[in-house]
Amino acid sequence: MSPIVKLLAQRIALSLLLLLLISVVIFAGTIVLPGDVAQSILGQSATPEALANLRAELGVNDPPVQRYFAWLFGAMQGDLGTALTSGQDIAQALSSRFWNTLFLAFWAAVVAVPLAIFLGLLAVRFKDRWPDKLISAVTLASISIPEFLIGYVLMYFIAVKLRWFPSVAMVNDNMGLFEKLNAIALPIAVLTLVVLAHMMRMTRAAILNVMQSAYIETAELKGLNAFQVIYRHAFPNAIAPIVNVVMLNLAYLVVGVVVIEVVFVYPGMGQYLVDHVSKRDVPVVQACGLIFAAVYIGLNMIADIVAILSNPRLRHPK
């Protein structure tokens, strides 16, 4: 087996092991929650016999290990269980909401990634001058403010005062693309501000590191202007760390939209999760947690693979 194949196999195996461990944490965390699931479903007036029958039906009395493996094997086959509060199949209920979350994350990435790279290039071009300092200050301020606060501030000024975009990001299948984009404009703006600083600063740092190379000095001696040196010579050789940090932020965009979906009442997985946490709907919480973990770990694994394939130094064991 070649070193690169072995390294890729190790990354994939570690990701699967991590997902398995997180599934244990998710399951254990939900079963130790206080309260009685049967009582919350049937209400305070339920008889002891009715409560006992429902507990037996839900498998609450089964050993935790048996319940865990039944849940895990079901999830591996696409069976995420049934919502306790509505009786609806969880996989079916999550299908449209999952795509809504991906839709929001995708368009946030479409805006954030090119903007972060452009600002990073601009900061390098004007290193230690006022554009560089201004970009760094604004992006650091955006990452320092809680995202829900940014959401409410934008909602107040842009949606309520200026009435440019709706304050509630409601989308449905009957809406056209531009209608949906208009509806999610504010959530996209908030998510962009949240992830912009990390990607911009990584772009800046990666390019500045490459600018110390000898071939950059050679390019400057050829008479190329500063922008040509940065864009044509430094930027292509700094792609690997930039792609890595972009993938990590894409993972955050998918998993970290929970707060934004709640703020803007967006019909995604985050909103669905919060609604059912308040109802103590354990199967829904477990399913959403497992999906979020799988997406996050999967995108991080892709980031590792891209870093390995794009950097020859990582292809060989140390």
Report the location of each language-model feature:
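An internal, D/E-rich "acidic patch" concept
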Residues: M1, N61-I117
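Alpha-helical transmembrane segments of integral membrane proteins
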Residues: S2-L8, S95-P131, E147, G176-K318
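N-terminal signal-anchor/signal peptide hydrophobic helix marking the start
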Residues: A9-S15, L19
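Hydrophobic alpha-helical transmembrane segments of membrane transport/permease proteins
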Residues: L18-F69, L162-A183
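Hydrophobic alpha-helical transmembrane segments of multi-pass integral membrane proteins
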Residues: L20-V24, P64, F106-V110, V153-L154, ...
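Membrane-water interface segments at the C-terminal ends of transmembrane alpha-helices
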Residues: V25-V32, D62, A70-F73, A137-V168, ...
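Membrane-interfacial helix-loop-helix junctions in multi-pass membrane proteins
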Residues: A56-V65, L80-I90, V171-I184, L191, ...
